[in-house]
Amino acid sequence: MTKGILGRKVGMTQVFTESGELIAVTAVEATPNVVLQVKNAETDGYSAIQLGYQDKRTVLSNKPEQGHASKANTAPKRYVREIRNAGDEFNVGDEIKVDTFQAGEYVDVTGITKGHGFQGAIKRLGQSRGPMTHGSRYHRRPGSMGAIINRVFKGKLLPGRMGNNKRTMQNIAIVHVDVENNLLLLKGNVPGANKSLLTVKSTVKVNAKHPEVKMANASASATNSEEA
């Protein structure tokens, strides 16, 4: 069974363990998600639940969205995502909160990376530059496309749009769960800018050798949660 919840990235902070070790964490605010639809293999071909996150004003939603949300007795949602293989214990209208997860679990976090616009090959792909002196006229250009062929080889390092891609980071440890403030404190950083949407799901690599998660000091975590 896969557990999942939608939230938004608040930012990064730091917490201390009981032994005094400092851990950098990312705060993810995950207000209660509403189950908008339950899909099963008989009717839809696969098993999944559809989650809605953050209410959307009625004037900004169309009639199909309003009708779909009314089946769950809730307002239209700004973000709607599916969590596959979530089990059969959910019904339309149920709420999923952060207490679904516990400190010490490992999760996979999916988000949209920061966009940097159109960038050159050096910044975008880490290509080495040419000589800057001694008459060289090759500094930050992409380089030769080839000698004779009338096409560009696949994989050629070229300028282009950088960032704004969907990325998933696996095996991220949950350091602390703040049920009162609807916060998950995840160890390290996660993809995306602040306030961006994140999908937190149970890790797919359940058999991986995970190091022991050092829990955060409860009092220190509460203070940092309020700051975040």
Swiss-Prot record:
Instruction: Name the gene for this chain.
Output: rplC
One GO BP annotation of this record: translation
Protein family: Belongs to the universal ribosomal protein uL3 family.
Q: Which GO terms describe its molecular function?
A: rRNA binding; structural constituent of ribosome
GO terms under cellular component? cytosolic large ribosomal subunit
Please give the function described in this protein's UniProt entry.
One of the primary rRNA binding proteins, it binds directly near the 3'-end of the 23S rRNA, where it nucleates assembly of the 50S subunit.
Q: What is the name of the protein in this document?
A: Large ribosomal subunit protein uL3
Q: Which PROSITE patterns match?
A: RIBOSOMAL_L3
Top-level division of the source organism's lineage: Bacteria
Gene3D superfamilies according to UniProt: 3.30.160.810, Translation factors (2.40.30.10)
Gene source species: Leuconostoc mesenteroides subsp. mesenteroides (strain ATCC 8293 / DSM 20343 / BCRC 11652 / CCM 1803 / JCM 6124 / NCDO 523 / NBRC 100496 / NCIMB 8023 / NCTC 12954 / NRRL B-1118 / 37Y)
Its quaternary structure? Part of the 50S ribosomal subunit. Forms a cluster with proteins L14 and L19.
Name the Pfam families on file: Ribosomal_L3
Cited NCBIfam families: L3_bact
InterPro entries, sorted = Ribosomal_uL3 (IPR000597), Ribosomal_uL3_bac/org-type (IPR019927), Ribosomal_uL3_CS (IPR019926), Transl_B-barrel_sf (IPR009000)
* Keywords from the UniProt entry: Ribonucleoprotein, Ribosomal protein, RNA-binding, rRNA-binding
